[in-house]
Each structure stands twice: as C-alpha cells, then as structure tokens.
Amino acid sequence: MANIKSQIKRNKTNEKARLRNKAVKSSLKTAIRKAREAVVAGDVEKATTAVRDASRQLDKAVSKGVIHKNAAANKKSALASKVASLQA
C-alpha cells in the first residue's frame, strides 16, 4: 500500500478507470462476437446490422482511449470484409 497521499488517490482513480475500461472491452467483445456469429450463420441483414453496431462501439472505445485507433480499424476492416464475402 502506498504511503504518499497523491499515490493513494492515483490508485483509486486507476482502479475506477480499470473497471470502466474492463466494462467497455467486455461489451466490445460481445458486439464483435455477435457480428461474427451472424456472418457464420449466413444472415446478411443481421450481419450488416451487427457489424454496424460493432463499428460504432469500436469508435466509441477509441474516443474513450480504451483501445488504439489502428486496432479498431483492423477489427472494423476484418468484420466488413467478412460481410462483403457474404454479399458476393
């Protein structure tokens, strides 16, 4: 345990941020999984809406600083290409 007052405060804020980031990442993984499952099922309409929702959540995670923008771009690109392969 820290003895310095400012470090005790930092520990509290870091813990809050960790829990917030964990919640965002968890919902993000769920959205991506739903999109992948819709693609595997072959439902084009459901897949496009799921990918749109996942892309939106990825962008929000980037703006909150939870994930890097390039990581989000890679995930969005992969999901979009899977949906495009369904439509072709």
UniProtKB/Swiss-Prot annotation:
GO cellular component: cytosol; small ribosomal subunit
Function description: Binds directly to 16S ribosomal RNA.
Organism this protein belongs to: Streptomyces griseus subsp. griseus (strain JCM 4626 / CBS 651.72 / NBRC 13350 / KCC S-0626 / ISP 5235)
Single annotated GO MF: structural constituent of ribosome
SUPFAM superfamilies, per the entry: Ribosomal protein S20
Gene3D superfamilies: Ribosomal protein S20
Region spans: Disordered: 1-27
HAMAP family, alphabetized: Ribosomal_bS20
UniProt keyword annotations, A-Z: Ribonucleoprotein, Ribosomal protein, RNA-binding, rRNA-binding
Upper lineage: Bacteria, Bacillati, Actinomycetota, Actinomycetes, Kitasatosporales
Full protein name: Small ribosomal subunit protein bS20
